[in-house]
Amino acid sequence: MTVAEIKKLALNNQVFNEAKALLEKGNVIFPKKFLKRKKIIIEVLDGKVFKVQINLKTAAAHLDCSCSNDKQNCVHIIAALLKYNDLKNQDNKEFDLNKADKLECKEVEILIENVSLAIVNGSWKLKIGFVINIDKVQTNTTALRFYCCDNKDVYFLHTEDEQLFRIALDKFNSVERQTLLIFDQLNKTKQMQYENNSLLFNLDQFLSLVKEVKKPSLFLLNEDKTDNILFLRSQHKINGLSHVCGFLNNKVFDFVSYNEKTKQIVLRLAYLNKFTDFKFPYNINIYKLAFGETLFFHFLIHLKMNGFKNIFFQSDVVIVKESEYLPKMFLTIEFNTQKNKFITDAFFKYKNKNSNTLTTVYPHRYYLAQKTNTSNFNRLLFYEQALQRFYEELFQIDYLRRFENIPIKDKNQIALFKTVFDDYKTIDLAELKLTSNLLNYKQLHFSISDIKALKIEDRQLKIEFKAGGIDLKLIKSVLSNYYKGNAICIGEDGWYDLNDENAKALISFWSQIDLRNATCDANNNLLLAKYHLFEVVDTISKYTDVTNLLDEKTALQLKIASENQFHLSLDNNQINNLRKYQKEGVKWIRALEDNQFGGILADEMGLGKTAQVIFAMLDSYQSTKSLLPSLIIVPASLLLNWKSEFQKFAPHVKIVTANGNFKERSQVYESLKNQILLMSFNVLRSDIKWISQKKFHYVVIDEAQGIKNENSTVTKAAKKIKGNFCLALTGTPIENRLLDLWSCFDFVLPNFLGNKKQFSDQFEKEKNDESFQKLMKKTSPFILRRTKNKVLKELPKKIITDIYVELSEEHQKLYDKQKTDGLKEIKESDAKNALNILSLILKLRHICSLVKDNDVNDFEDNSKANAALNIIYEALENKRKVILFTQFLDVIDCFKQTLKNQKIDHLVFDGRKTVKNRNTIIQKFNSAKEPCVMLASLKAGGVGINLTAAEVVIHFDVWWNSAVENQATDRAHRIGQSKTVQVYRIIAKNTIEERVCQVQNQKQELVKKTLVEDVNFFKSLSHEELLKLFE
C-alpha cells in the first residue's frame, strides 16, 4: 500500500498529519518478526498506549483500534499503516557497508526461493533465486557475508579492494571463509552472474570447487521463507567418504556420500523424506515438485551426465542399486504418416518386489494413481513427473503424454529432436527412441523427362513413368504439408525440406494437377479419371512438347474434344434448321459423350438449349444404336414445352411422360425401352427407388439450378441415377454462390471438383483472381456458355432503363419509420443475426411497392405504381404487349384490381396457378391479337417459359439477385423475338432499393471472373456489411 493510498483511508487531512507526527516521534511500536504473522498488534503512544490490530491475511479489510473513537480509520490506525508501509519498503534494501559502523553491521540471511538447472548459451547453469530477509537480523556480527549490488555481476562488499577483502576474511570462521572464497572465485572467473534476483552458476565449476574444499563448506538455502533451512556441507572424513549433508530443524541429515575407492555414490532417502510430502492430491496435474525433490532430481541428473553409473539408494539400513529402486522410462517420438502427425509414447516400468517381473505405468494417467495396484512396487510419482518435465523441456514439447499430437514446424524442430536424441541416448535416465523417418534427411526429385507417355486406357488417363514409377503417397503428403504452410514433410523413411529447390520444382508441377482421387498401377504409373486429360496436357505443355508423349488414339481424342471437331452422323437436311452456334453446341455435347465425360450447357436463356439437346440425342442414337432409354428431368411447368419441342424437331421419336398416379407411372416404367422419358423433379423425388435401378443412355436435367442444394432430396435422387452420359442445362450455373456450380458438376462429373468442403476451401473461401482463374481453366472444357450479344447478332436489342421515382411525403414517412424502428431493434439485440437484417430489407422493399398493406383500391399516392401504370398505358396505346414482374403477390392483386377498374385486358401468371393453367395463360398471351398486360411473379417467370410476344418488360421491385431478374427478362428477349424489347426497372430514390442497385453494380467484377452469371451477394455479406446498406 502506498502513502497516497493510506492518505485516502484517513478521515481527513488533519487525521493524516497527526498520524505522521506520531510516526516521526517514534510512537509506533511493531512486534519482532511481524512479517511472518497473519495478525499483528501494534502499540501507538498517544497520551496512553492504544493497540491497533491488523489482519495481514485480509490486508486492510480488518483494522481495529482500542481507542474510544467509534469511527473507522482513526489517527492510530493511519499511523500504524504508515509504519507498516515503511518497514515493508525496507525489505530487500541494500546495506552500504562503507557508510555503516562496522561494530553495528548486521548479518542478513539470504533466503533461497528456488534452485533449478537451466541451459544458458549452450552450457548447464545452476540457478539460485533469492531474496534478502531484513526480518532475520542478527546483531553481534562484524560484517555482511555477501551481497549483490547491480544487475550484471555479483560483487561482495568486502571485495571493493583486495586488502579490505582479506581483512574481512579474518572476521569469518573457517566455514564462512571457504564459502566466500568459492563465490569470489566464481565471480572473478565470470562463472557466476546475477539475473532477476537469481545467482547463476556454472554447475561443473561450482561442484569442482566444493570438492576441493578441505574443510567443511557452508551453503545456506531456504525454501519459501520457512524455517526449514538446508545447509549443503561438503566434508572429507578419514575413511575416505565425502559427504554432502542437509541441516533441517537443527538436525543434520546425510544427503549423499561418495567412496572414491569404489566409485560408489549412495543417495540417502532419509533426507528426501524430510523434504517431501507424499500425500498426492487426486488432480496431480497441478502438483508442484517440492524443493527437496527438485534438488534431488537435478543432482541425480548431474551425476548421470558426468558418467557416474555406480549409484545406490539407502533407506534406513538397506542399500539398493538405482535400477532396483527407480523405474525405467521409455520414451518414443514417432511421426505417423497415416495420420500425418507426431505421436509420443511415454511410460515407466517398475521392478516388482521379490520377482523379476515388471509393471508398466503411464505418467499422464495421474488420475489413476490411487487405483494403481502398488503392492508389488513403490511408485515414485514425483520422479515420474520430474523426468517427464525434464524431457519436455529438452524436446520443447508441451506435454509428453501417450498419443499426444505435436504440430509440424520446420527442419529446426527435427534438428532439435536429433540433437537431444544423440546427446542423451547414452545417459541412463530413459530409453529414447526416434523413428527412422525423423533421423534421415532425404531430398525430393522432379524432372519432366521422367514422364514417358500419356494415354487413355479403360476410361482412365495413365501417365507412364520411366524406371521406378512415381511415389504418389509421398507427393500427396508433400502437397498436403505445403498447402498447410509446413516447411517440412515427413515420409515413411525420412523427412524432406520443402524449401529445397528440388522440392519447389516438384510442388510447382504437381500442384497444378488434381491428385485427390489418383491411384497407381502395379508399375507405379499414375492413374487419373479421364476428365483430367485437359489439365494434365496443359500442365505438361508448359515444360515440354506434350505431343511427343501422346499415343495416336489419345492425341485424336484430345484434338476432337478441344477443337470441337466431332463429326455428326446426322445429314445436313436434319440440322439445317439449327443456327451455327447451335450446331457447335450439338458437336460439343456429342464430343463429351464420346469421351465418356459429362457437361453443363450454360447458354444464356433464349438461345435454344432444348433444341441442341434434342439433336445431340438424335445423333447419338443414330450413331451408337443404343437400346437404352434416356431420361430428361425438368420443372413440371416445362413438361409440355419439351414434348412440343420434340414434336417440332423430332416427331418420329417416341416421348413418354411420367405423370398420373404411381400405378400409371409404374406401367410407363415397366414398358420403357429406348424411348425418351420426361419426368418432373417432384416425380423423381417420389420414384427414385425405381429410377435408380434403371440404366439410361442420356440423363439430362433442365433448369439444373434446381439441384444446387446438395442436401435436398431431389439433388440426392438425381445423383443416384445411372447414365452413360449426364448433361445439365442452366442459364444460371451460379445463382447464389459458387457452390451452385460445384453441385451441378457433382452430378455430371462426380468428384471432378472434389467434395463440397474441398471445393469450398479451394475456391469459395479464397475468392481471389488466382483461384477464379484456376476454376475457370479447370471447368472450361466441360461447360459451354454463349451469350445472345455474342452469337445472335440478328437478335433485336434489349434496352434497359432505370426509372427513379421519389416517394410521396406520406409514403416516405411510413418508410422512414419502419427503417428507424427496425434498425433500433436490430442494434439493441445481442444476437448479430443477418436474417433479422434481411427480414427488415424485405419489409422495406415491400413498403416501397405499397403505401400500406392490402391497398387494393387506390394507387393515387403511390409514385412507383403510377410510374409503372404510365408505362403500361403508353405501351398499350402503341399496340405493345407488357409483362410486369414483381416479387409480391399482393402487388399483383393491387395491379389486377386497378387494371380491372380501367377495363384493361390482363392475365395473371404466378405460383397460385396450376401447371395446366399456366400453359394456357402463356398461349393466350402469345396468341392475343390485341395488346394486353401480364402480371407475373418473378419466380414464375424463371422456369423456361416463352413470352416473345411481349415488347415491354417492367420490373416493379428490384430483386436482390439480378440473375433471376435477367432470367425473367429473357422470357421475352429470346429466339423468336423480332422486335426490340424495352426493359424498365422502377426504383424508389432514397430507399433500400437504391442502395441494393449500387451494391450490385459494385459486385459485377465477380461475375466476369467466374465465367457465368450473377451471384446473390447478400447471402455472403456479413452483419456489418448488411447494416451499411442503410447508410
UniProtKB/Swiss-Prot annotation:
List the SWIM-type zinc finger ranges. Answer: 50-85
Enzyme kind, highest EC tier: hydrolase
Q: What is its EC number?
A: 3.6.4.-
Q: A Gene Ontology MF term for this entry?
A: zinc ion binding
Has UniProt tagged this entry with the keyword Nucleotide-binding? yes
Cross-referenced InterPro entries, in alphabetical order? Answer: Helicase_ATP-bd, Helicase_C-like, P-loop_NTPase, SNF2-like_sf, SNF2/RAD54-like_C, SNF2_N, Znf_SWIM
Per the database record, which ranges form the Helicase C-terminal domain? 868-1022
| Domain spans labelled Helicase ATP-binding | 590-751
In the record, which residues are listed under signal peptide? none
Q: Where is this motif: DEAQ box?
A: 702-705
Deletion consequences:
Not essential, it can be deleted.
The highest taxon in the source lineage is Bacteria
Which GO biological process annotations does it have? positive regulation of transcription by RNA polymerase II
**Positions of ATP binding:** 603-610
Q: Is Zinc-finger given among the entry's keywords? A: yes
Q: Which Pfam families match?
A: Helicase_C (PF00271), SNF2-rel_dom (PF00176), SWIM (PF04434)
User: Per UniProt, which keywords does this protein have?
Assistant: ATP-binding, Helicase, Hydrolase, Metal-binding, Nucleotide-binding, Zinc, Zinc-finger
List, alphabetically, the CDD domains matched.
DEXQc_arch_SWI2_SNF2, SF2_C_SNF
- Please give the PANTHER family that the UniProt record associates with this protein: SNF2/RAD54 HELICASE FAMILY
Q: Which family does it belong to?
A: Belongs to the SNF2/RAD54 helicase family.
Write down what this protein is called. Uncharacterized ATP-dependent helicase MG018
